[in-house]
Curated annotation (Swiss-Prot):
UniProt protein name: Glycerol kinase
Organism this protein belongs to: Mesorhizobium japonicum (strain LMG 29417 / CECT 9101 / MAFF 303099)
CC per GO annotation: cytosol
Lineage: superkingdom: Bacteria
Residues noted as binding glycerol in the record, renumbered to the chain: R82, E83, Y134, D243, Q244
HAMAP family: Glycerol_kin (MF_00186)
Protein's GO biological process: glycerol catabolic process; glycerol metabolic process; glycerol-3-phosphate metabolic process
């Protein structure tokens, strides 16, 4: 059997398809961006049809670029932007509304209402999550409430709902399979992570009929086969994981205590806690890292909504840079005597604050502040927010030592300046791997190992290779002063 495995990486701003060969090297790829829709303040939507078209286009491009046919591919692994939801017609496969994206804040009033009813502890105890618009459950409820006839059709069994992976699986299999994996399910706010099942009580609170939801499977499992006429041959779908979980796998963080952080649009740090379902006392999330062979591995997660998006804001919003790649060079030119802080709460603050009403702010500006100081503040904000997460993780999990090593991936980690500043602020080594396509690699490994053409976990972990380790160089006094300034800036940004 061929060792070629195709990863579909459906992200927030673009879709990528990457074909890996039997040595787990990239053989071909395709990428296509798609539109972001902002129908109201705090609202973010995607057109599911555009996402679907981007998947078909990029898969064909990856195969063409590699000079391979669909019949050469042993399996497909899917990884996706999490929490983003689609509700579609069971008969036609047509969405009844645009996908509501993970960044969307429209359900903040519903979350506040549920909090006032004293329900947050119940949701947290069962799902490991907090009552925040970030998660899928309230988004599904909103669509059913706001789309004409939505609730009635849902009760009659005419509709299906799911995260992006479920919608893609449904389309790829020609409507034969409605499924998701445990990691995506764990982000919905209605999945009991201790019992590994949809929670009837939480579904009732949000008035979501269980019949809408997909079957939950292991991350490496049988998700059906693609329709022959899509790519010219049937391809088995054997792996599915949310993007951050796939990155955890791609970084070979299989042992308790191992930690990875992905720096893309947002920043997401996951700490493997093994079979230990840790209840955070510091406003972190408890989530499923992955589920393999029926065994669940848990993680603590810190979610930061704005990381690379702050650099996009520098480029597209205030236009102080022409290209995102210029940010590190510009930051290096900043006046070291200026203490400018950017708190990038453009859509609220994530962990560990979880303040949906907070908004972005800049502190410490002087007449001499310019593009360089803005660039440095944007990049340093990523490091400061990661430090907040690491501190919370160290408080929450007894197995976390002060000798943490952070494995990093995502678009921002190509910047040496950003990675060095991250190591300085964390006071911990930061490891950048040789393969930066860790999210796609993780999805491919799930499918390839299930197909029997790629190695099992232990051998796969041995293949992880370090490109560069960034060691802390900042002195204690400077670090302490910078962190104190950051915490003061955050305090002044919080809504209450």
């Amino acid at each position: 059997m061929s060792g070629f495995v195709l990863a579909i990486d459906q992200g927030t701003t673009s879709t990528r398809a990457i074909l890996f060969d039997g040595q787990m090297k990239v053989a071909g790829s395709g990428q296509k961006e798609f539109a972001q829709h902002y129908p109201a303040s705090g609202w973010v939507e995607h057109d599911p049809e555009e996402i679907w078209a981007s998947v078909v286009t990029t898969v064909k491009a990856a195969l063409k670029n590699a000079g391979k046919a669909a019949s050469d591919v042993a399996a497909i692994g899917i990884t996706n932007q999490r929490e983003t939801v689609v509700v579609w017609d069971r008969a036609t496969g047509k969405p009844i509304h645009n996908a509501i994206v993970w960044q969307d804040r429209r359900t903040a009033p519903l979350c506040q209402k549920l909090k006032k009813q004293g329900l947050e502890k119940k949701f947290t105890r069962k799902t490991g999550l907090l009552l925040d618009p970030y998660f899928s459950g309230t988004k599904i409820a909103w669509i059913l409430d706001k789309v004409k006839g939505g609730r009635k059709r849902a009760e009659k069994g005419e509709l299906l709902a799911g995260t992006i992976d479920s919608f893609l699986i449904w389309r790829l299999t020609g409507g034969k399979v409605h499924a998701t994996d445990a990691t995506n399910a764990s982000r919905t706010l209605v999945y009991n992570i201790a019992e590994n099942a949809w929670d009837d009580e939480l579904l009732a609170i949000l008035n979501i009929p269980a019949k809408l939801l997909p079957q939950v499977k292991d991350c490496a499992d049988d998700y059906g086969v693609t329709e022959r006429d899509l790519f010219g041959a049937e391809i088995r779908i054997l792996g599915v994981a949310g993007d951050q979980h796939a990155a955890t796998i791609g970084q070979a963080c299989f042992e308790p205590g191992m930690m990875k952080s992905t720096y893309g649009t947002g920043c997401f740090a996951l700490l493997n806690t093994g079979s230990d379902l840790v209840r955070s006392k510091n406003r972190l999330l408890t989530t499923i890292a992955y589920r393999l062979n029926g065994k669940t591995t848990y993680a603590l997660e810190g979610s930061i909504f704005i990381a690379g998006a702050a650099v996009q804001w520098l480029r597209d919003g205030i236009k102080v840079i022409g290209k995102a790649e210029q940010s590190g060079k510009l930051a290096d030119e900043a006046d070291p005597t200026q203490n400018v802080y950017l708190v990038p709460a453009f859509v609220g603050l994530g962990a560990p604050h979880w303040d949906a009403e907070a908004r972005g702010a800049i502190f410490g500006l002087t007449r001499n502040s310019g593009p360089a100081e803005f660039a440095r503040a944007a990049l340093e904000a990523v490091a400061y927010q990661t430090r907040d997460l690491l501190d919370a993780m160290r408080k929450d999990w007894k197995g976390t030592s002060a000798k943490t090593v952070l494995r990093v991936d995502g678009g921002m980690v190509a910047s040496d300046w950003t990675m060095q500043r991250l190591a300085d602020i964390l006071d911990a080594p930061v490891d950048r791997p040789t393969i930066l396509e860790t999210t796609a690699l993780g999805a491919a490994w799930l499918a390839g190992s299930k197909a029997g053409v790629w190695p099992k976990a232990k051998e796969f972990a041995k293949s992880w290779a370090l490109e560069r380790r960034f060691k802390p160089e900042m002195d204690i006094a400077t670090r302490s002063a910078k962190l104190a300034g950051w915490r003061d800036a955050v305090r002044r940004t919080l809504s209450a």
